[in-house]
């Protein structure tokens, strides 16, 4: 009896402890859901979107974090997480190791050489790296109560949200296509920006990409001390970027550009629809030239004269627009129907991606600034399929520039430099190639005001624009490539001890019958087996007999491919092995 009483007492104690823990867990869950709801209320309430807190907590504590990435290096990697957590106190992401944890790639210490991935699209920038700390899932017992984020998250950094070029090139375009890289993400994801900036001047543009309000790092503190994402994608695709800013070598086009005008225009179509901007005809009722007017620096000092001369030269209306005085939707509406866009070098020129096909971009450069050294907008305008004409004009007359050496250094001032360096900069005729981002000579020159020499500008434009500028109706500009030639065959014959013939034939690529192609040619490579060199032939027919330099009793390797319009090279068919 005594032992039975003791056992019953212990059992009651255990049951009481279990019930107490269950009640506390339910209270815990209710409290956290209320906190999350309150935290989200001012941002973007999501009716009906809740998470089963006890189940989520159990999955995290038992299973841990799960990660699978695409990409071979940190510069091209995007990772998909389940149950990735973030400590607002430590400002670090956490990977909890549990029974079901997966970490692919499992890099060990190589994860810190230098990072798991880039959070922004600016490649290998040491302020944009992403990594996490590791903990056993059991550590959750000693940590703040986790708040589970029910949304699918896309976690990234904005590079410079106050600069329109950076907003489009580094953020919006990559975000747009990253959201479409994974099924359903564009409709479900909430954007989480972790770089630490405030909203910035163009935050409304980021809101267009997702039906859910983006969140900044500073806003996460209102949700809880420890946040856990049930489902998160981390990183951005860099495939749409075309320019590097000069952190390692002087700025210029990327070495391997993978985007075309087609992808740019798909993006701009989406943006104009979200901005409620119509492409149906010019908003002013006629064709016009659009001039970007700057109001604070890099001014065009004879802007009125420039407008008049452009109107007279091209017999078209001229209109000014500025980022300061127009809404961005109005800017897009004007740009997307303009025949020509004229602007000083600057971030506003990224709006050229909204220009219609056949329009002209005219970029003006201040004194001593070489257009060949600063080409983000030239590179954009000349992407395959953008179908824009590009003109660069440079002020070559020192007297036509107004400098501002007294301004702060970040606005081109040079009075903080020693007198010898100031004198050198003032006498310089061209800014040397340099790295980003604080070169005083570059800043001094790029923030100059300019009186445009009208005759030299018109001469520069006329070298490119032969007739009346403006959009033109064009055929589908996408270049379609041939497939492999089919049924390639070879036949050899020997004529005597020193002569031989090699006949090669093939059928057209099967996709050719569905295409309208101006010119079709075939390239044939002949290589004697064992030799390192080959002889190329360009042919118009689907068969040919080779006699020159064909040897008897010799084996030849033969490759054949189709070429459209002299530049669209198809793949080689499988190699033919032909013996004479």
Curated annotation (Swiss-Prot):
The membrane topology noted for this protein in its Swiss-Prot or TrEMBL record is:
Single-pass type II membrane protein
Q: Which residues form the signal peptide?
A: none
The record describes the protein's role as:
O-linked mannose beta-1,4-N-acetylglucosaminyltransferase that transfers UDP-N-acetyl-D-glucosamine to the 4-position of the mannose to generate N-acetyl-D-glucosamine-beta-1,4-O-D-mannosylprotein. Involved in the biosynthesis of the phosphorylated O-mannosyl trisaccharide (N-acetylgalactosamine-beta-3-N-acetylglucosamine-beta-4-(phosphate-6-)mannose), a carbohydrate structure present in alpha-dystroglycan (DAG1), which is required for binding laminin G-like domain-containing extracellular proteins with high affinity.
Q: Which InterPro entries match?
A: FN3_dom (IPR003961), FN3_sf (IPR036116), Glyco_transf_61_cat (IPR049625), Glycosyltransferase_61 (IPR007657), Ig-like_fold (IPR013783)
The GO cellular component terms are:
endoplasmic reticulum; endoplasmic reticulum membrane
The protein here is known as Protein O-linked-mannose beta-1,4-N-acetylglucosaminyltransferase 2
Pfam families the UniProt entry points to: Glyco_transf_61
- UniProt-listed GO biological process terms: neuron migration; protein O-linked glycosylation; protein O-linked mannosylation
Keywords noted in UniProt: Endoplasmic reticulum, Glycoprotein, Glycosyltransferase, Membrane, Signal-anchor, Transferase, Transmembrane, Transmembrane helix
Location(s) in or outside the cell: Endoplasmic reticulum membrane
Q: Annotated pathway, please? A: Protein modification; protein glycosylation
Q: What is its EC number?
A: 2.4.1.312
Q: Which GO terms describe its molecular function?
A: acetylglucosaminyltransferase activity; protein O-acetylglucosaminyltransferase activity
């Amino acid at each position: 009896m005594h032992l039975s009483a003791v056992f019953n007492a212990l059992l009651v104690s255990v049951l009481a402890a279990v019930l107490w823990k269950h009640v506390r867990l339910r209270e815990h869950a209710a409290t956290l859901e209320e906190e999350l709801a309150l935290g989200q209320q001012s941002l973007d309430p999501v009716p009906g979107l809740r998470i089963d807190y006890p189940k989520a907590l159990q999955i995290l504590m038992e299973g841990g974090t799960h990660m699978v990435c695409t990409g071979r290096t940190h510069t091209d990697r995007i990772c998909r997480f389940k149950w990735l957590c973030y400590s607002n106190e430590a400002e670090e992401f956490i990977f909890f190791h549990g029974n079901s944890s997966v970490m692919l790639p499992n890099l060990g210490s190589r994860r810190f050489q230098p990072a798991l991935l880039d959070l922004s699209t600016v490649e290998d920038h040491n302020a944009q790296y992403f990594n996490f700390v590791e903990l056993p899932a059991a550590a959750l017992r000693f940590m703040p109560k986790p708040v589970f984020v029910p949304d699918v998250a896309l976690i990234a950094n904005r590079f410079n949200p106050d600069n329109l070029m950076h907003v489009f090139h580094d953020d919006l375009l990559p975000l747009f296509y990253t959201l479409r890289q994974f099924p359903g993400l564009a409709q479900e994801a909430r954007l989480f920006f972790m770089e630490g900036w405030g909203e910035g001047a163009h935050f409304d543009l980021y809101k267009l990409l997702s039906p859910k309000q983006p969140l900044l790092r500073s806003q996460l503190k209102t949700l809880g001390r420890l946040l856990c994402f049930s489902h998160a994608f981390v990183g951005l695709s860099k495939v749409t970027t075309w320019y590097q800013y000069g952190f390692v070598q002087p700025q210029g086009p990327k070495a391997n550009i993978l985007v075309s005008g087609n992808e740019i225009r798909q993006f701009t179509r989406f943006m104009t629809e979200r901005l409620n901007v119509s492409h149906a005809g010019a908003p002013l009722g006629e064709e016009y030239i659009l001039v970007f007017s700057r109001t604070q620096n890099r001014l065009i000092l004879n802007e009125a004269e420039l407008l008049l001369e452009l109107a007279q030269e091209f017999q078209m209306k001229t209109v000014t627009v500025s980022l300061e005085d127009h809404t961005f939707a109005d800017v897009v509406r004007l740009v997307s129907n303009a025949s020509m866009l004229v602007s000083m070098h600057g971030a506003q020129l990224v709006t050229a991606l909204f220009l219609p096909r056949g329009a002209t971009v005219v970029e003006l450069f201040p004194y001593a600034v070489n257009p060949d050294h600063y080409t983000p907008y030239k590179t954009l305008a000349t992407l395959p399929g953008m179908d824009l004409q590009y003109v660069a004009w440079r002020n070559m007359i020192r007297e036509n520039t107004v400098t501002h050496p007294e301004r702060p250094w970040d606005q081109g001032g040079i009075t903080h430099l020693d007198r010898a360096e100031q004198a050198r900069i003032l006498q310089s005729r061209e800014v040397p190639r340099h790295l980003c981002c604080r070169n005083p000579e570059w800043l001094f020159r790029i923030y100059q005001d300019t009186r445009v020499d009208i005759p030299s500008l018109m001469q520069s434009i006329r070298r490119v624009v032969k007739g009346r500028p403006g959009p033109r109706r064009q055929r589908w500009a996408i270049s379609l490539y041939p497939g492999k030639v089919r049924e390639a065959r070879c036949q050899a014959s020997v004529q005597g001890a020193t002569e031989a013939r090699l006949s090669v034939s093939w059928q057209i690529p099967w996709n050719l019958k569905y295409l309208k192609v101006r010119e079709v040619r075939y390239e044939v490579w002949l290589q004697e087996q064992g030799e390192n060199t080959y002889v190329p032939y360009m042919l118009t027919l689907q068969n040919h007999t080779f006699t020159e330099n064909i040897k008897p009793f010799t084996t030849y390797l033969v490759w054949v491919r189709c070429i459209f319009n002299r530049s669209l090279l198809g793949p080689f068919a499988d190699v033919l092995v032909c013996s004479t």
